[in-house]
Amino acid sequence: MKIKMGKMYKYFLKGEEPMKHLKYLLLLVMIISIVLSFSGCSFRFSSFDSLLRPPKLSGEYQGLQDSFEKLVDKDYSLSTPENGLYRSAFIVYDFDKDKSLEAIVFYTEKKKPDLVKFYYFESKDGAFTPVASYDGLGSSVDEVKIADLNRDGKFEIIIGWNLFSSKTNKAFAVYDISSGNLKLLSSFPYSYLDIIDVNGDGIDDIFAMSVDSSVSDHYTSAATAYTYDAKTSSLQVLSTVKTDGNISSYADITVEKVDDTRLIYVEAYKGENDMITEVIYWDDNINALVSPLFDVSTQTTTQTLRHMKLSCRDIDNDGFIEIPVSVDMNGSSIVDNSAPQTLLTASADNTVNQTKSLYYTKWVKFRDDKLRAVQYSVIDENGGYVLNIPSSWVGRITVLGNDGQWDFYRWESYDEKLGKLLFSINYYDKNDSTLKQKYKNTKLLASYSSTDYVYTITEDGEYFGVTDDILTSNFNTTVLGGKK
């Protein structure tokens, strides 16, 4: 079976017909092999040589695998890229733009199980012909990207290699195809990368984030742009800038053009639940990358810290990206679903849920090297909804919440105490008749999948300024995808 995705083709591996007397056993083996091939794991065919031959590529590309298997030892494993667009051990593409296909196949051999190798094939007269085999730089493949970095009209192949299964320590290699075979141009360490025209000259560059864990007392990190240098026929560092090194992994890179500036938003995790966004751009005045939110004195980026797994996005539908930032909400207390479900109280007969403080989420735009607030929200991660609130409510309301119900109270900041109940938001399974009866006197906020979200406003809430329109027009379940 062939699936077309743009210009790229991905292939599913399909098993041979099993013998009748091993019907059920072989069916189980085939299911396991398919699951493993999709999960980014290597699958060692020789373990099942006595039962069935290696699964075959289907259709016109079956000859590619036949040719490949004649070149390698019988005992081999296919190695599938773990991330990115290309998620098959067999990648077929017109890399050199000559209107005929080429292919690369990632694999490991029994004698060198910690080294991924790859074969390069060209297609001639409808058949794939092997060109050469190459040693990779790591124990598995992180991802594969393509880009015309040297402007010769042909794509270079960028392969990211994992070094001993580390989340941050990797190396990418750039291979040129113009001579008819693959030539290694350059390789550099990285933790996360993307293809971006960093300085706006019309030529793609490699933009990479890298964490250096060799420093004994703290990690350091940097954003680096690599560009092709015609004099040396290799990649050279265009510019590099320091970033927060106290991160556990990178999540995503997003590029936004504002006026004549390309803003690069780098999402990073700090531990299990905290995130930051680095904002990096090319400064034409100094011809270099800059990271204005990075605090040199503390070696951290704290201005975009939030205590939840939430990435930047266009929250107000104005066509531009906003960054979420956590702001303390005094007096708040909600059930902590990331903690153990219950704790024993002083009385052994009772148990209570662990709780945690809630935060307002401030959505900010990056303009003129500063962050400007454009929206405030209260976010229920477990309930899967976002409630945008007027900025005048910040510091004046707080939340007490259990699973399925959040109560919004007036916060008396002068006395630092809980005030009157203003409104409540509940959610429940719309197919549960008992709960539907319980909430029959509430008003509907939204329905998402099998969940109904409802609300009630108290007289004190109406006096405070809470209205039906404020709640219904600012309630959103699509950002988080509804109840978890």
What spans do the regions from the language model cover?
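Extracytosolic low-complexity repeat regions of secreted or lipid-anchored proteins
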Residues: G331-I334, L435-V466
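Generic recognition of long tandem-repeat/solenoid scaffolds
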Residues: I206, I264, L387, G404-S413, ...
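Surface-exposed amphipathic alpha-helical segments
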Residues: Y455-K484
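Short, Lys/Arg-enriched N-terminal segments with co-localized hydrophobic residues
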Residues: M1-P18
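Secretory pathway targeting signatures of secreted, lumenal, and periplasmic proteins
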Residues: S392-K440, L444-L445
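Sec-dependent N-terminal signal peptides of Gram-positive bacterial secreted proteins and lipoproteins
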Residues: M19-S46
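Beta-propeller-forming repeat regions
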Residues: F38-T398, A446-Y448, G481-K484
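Secondary-structure transition/turn motif
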Residues: A268-Y269, S326-D328, Y409-E416, I457-E462
